[in-house]
A protein has these predicted regions:
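Core Rossmann-like FAD-binding/catalytic domain of the broad FAD-dependent monooxygenase superfamily
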Residues: 1-350, 354-361
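Helical substrate-recognition/capping region of FAD-dependent monooxygenase/halogenase enzymes
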Residues: 1-4, 8, 24, 33, ...
Length: 489
């Protein structure tokens, strides 16, 4: 085998997955078509759940001070993310190019292998391994691996070569994006519906502004390259009245509003993550964030299966958990597209939504959906509200000093948090101690009515989601350990 796992694509999804696999002790090779990183940034920031994920792996400090904004939107209607409870709420502005740089350094620092300038031409699932045909700087070569994961974007070669069904709708609108230097542009950070379409603008720093413009009635077009800047400037002037033709274009692109998702995230030994599995209108900055979270869900499971710590059936839970998340992503981005991009016939609905958002419960629902903080997986954890949800950040005190639930997840292992100092709980988990860290610690400054207020013990998966909780007895603990971490040893 050339590598236990080959990941195709060195964007945020592929690099995050590579790092997760290395944390799980699996050798991984990343194949990237581009010979060097691009400075272009489609994504401009993180949502709250992605910040938590990066913090759980110790990556977040590499992005600088955690300065977040609580101002978000849903279809151009302002939403206050401050109504959410969490370690980090709101949105942190970070260009995608910076995210890729940080994740590449993190993954390579843990031993991942990255081959740039390598294009996948074909692949064959042989049942017990996969053969990948690659064109590289030194010519064609065949690589063998136990599993392949396509993280190669909306036009995924892996998805097509492996025969994944990709139902949904193609783009029916075209939007322009341009990063421009030398123009004074009024900020419209959450977008603005104007008589002829929708416009959005925001400063990126260093004298560069980003604009997005969608002219109503402009059909989707198959382009072989970026649109001419003057075409973008003309559309901007028609919609806003502002002449930006004298600006210096740093980057120009066009995109649409497709809504497609693969029917299955896995076919045999080939899996998909990120835009390879789902494409959608980039509304609310969700695309990169959902992609990273796909990889964090898959990484520990694939590592456990490859290393023999868990049965292959664990991989089925990747589709079971992430496909509904992707489906909901398409639903909410389509709804936002209707609000953003439709004509005056949609104005009554916009006005009603603006009224509803004033209620905290509505804002909390929409903010939770866009941020990813409201995701709950089916983990058979009983009636307690926490199983299946993300583990909240909580300061802890143990015999050797202070720690936190976030810090305990840095190694990407399971964690059994013994809050009540219960020897029976610790004894029950000893057969999994090679895969699960058993930690005795008390809660520090926990809110009296918080989610952990009555917990005696909590089992947390490597991706930070609660698999089991004990308000009283240890019933169900060994079953949860067996389900998520394989048989006792």
């Amino acid at each position: 085998m050339d590598a236990s796992v080959i990941v195709v694509g060195a964007g945020p999804a592929g690099l995050m997955l590579a790092g997760e696999l290395r944390l799980g002790g699996v050798d991984v090779m990343v194949l990237e078509q581009l010979s060097q990183r691009t400075g272009e940034s489609r994504g401009l920031g993180f949502t709250a759940r992605t910040m938590e994920v990066f913090d759980q792996r110790g990556i977040l400090p590499a992005f600088g001070p955690v300065e977040t904004s609580t101002q978000g939107h849903f279809g151009g209607r302002p939403v206050d993310f401050g109504v959410l409870e969490g370690a980090h709420y709101g949105v942190k502005a970070v260009p995608q190019s910076t995210t890729e740089s940080v994740l590449e350094e993190w993954a390579l620092g843990r031993g991942a292998e990255l081959l740039r300038g390598h294009t996948v031409r074909a692949l064959t699932d042989e049942g017990d391994h996969v053969v990948v045909e690659v064109e590289g700087p030194d010519g064609p070569r065949s690589l063998t691996t136990r599993y392949v994961v396509g993280c190669d974007g909306g036009r995924s070669t892996v998805r097509k070569a492996a025969g994944f069904d990709f139902p949904g709708t193609s783009a029916n609108r075209e939007m322009f994006l341009a990063d421009i230097r030398g123009c004074e542009i009024t900020p419209r950070p959450i977008g603005e519906t104007v008589p002829l379409g929708m416009v959005m603008s925001a400063p990126l720093g260093d004298g560069v502004d980003r604009i997005i413009v969608c002219e109503r009635g402009a059909p989707a077009r198959r382009r072989t390259g970026p649109p001419p800047y003057q075409e973008v400037a003309a559309a901007w002037q028609r919609l806003t009245g502002q002449d930006i033709s004298h600006g210096e274009p740093v980057w120009v692109s066009a995109f649409g509003d497709p809504a497609r998702q693969v029917s299955a995230y896995r076919r045999g030994r080939v899996l998909l993550a990120g835009d390879s599995a789902h494409v959608h209108l980039p509304a609310g900055g969700q695309g990169m964030n959902v992609s990273v979270q796909d990889s964090v869900n898959l990484g520990w499971k694939l590592a456990a299966v490859v290393s023999g710590r868990a049965p292959a059936g664990l991989l089925d839970t990747y589709h079971e958990e992430r496909h509904p998340v992707g489906r909901r992503l398409l639903m909410n981005t389509q709804a936002q597209g209707m609000l953003f991009l439709s004509g005056d016939e949609m104005q009554p609905l916009r006005d009603v939504l603006s009224e509803l958002i004033r209620y905290d419960e509505v804002s909390r629902h929409l903010a939770g959906m866009v941020s990813g903080l409201d995701i709950r997986y089916e983990v058979d954890g009983g009636d307690h509200p926490l199983p299946g949800m993300r583990m909240p950040h909580q300061e802890l005190v143990r015999a050797d000093g202070k720690t936190s639930t976030t810090e305990l997840l840095h190694p990407a292992r399971g964690v059994l948090l013994d809050i009540a100092d219960d020897a029976d709980v610790r004894e029950a988990a000893t057969g999994w101690s090679d895969r699960v860290d058993i930690v005795t610690a008390s809660l520090h400054d926990a809110p009296p009515q918080g989610p952990l207020s009555e917990a005696r013990a909590v089992l947390v998966r490597p991706d930070g989601y609660v698999a089991w909780i004990s308000p009283g007895s240890r019933a169900g603990l060994t079953e949860a350990l067996d389900r998520w971490f394989g048989p006792a040893r």
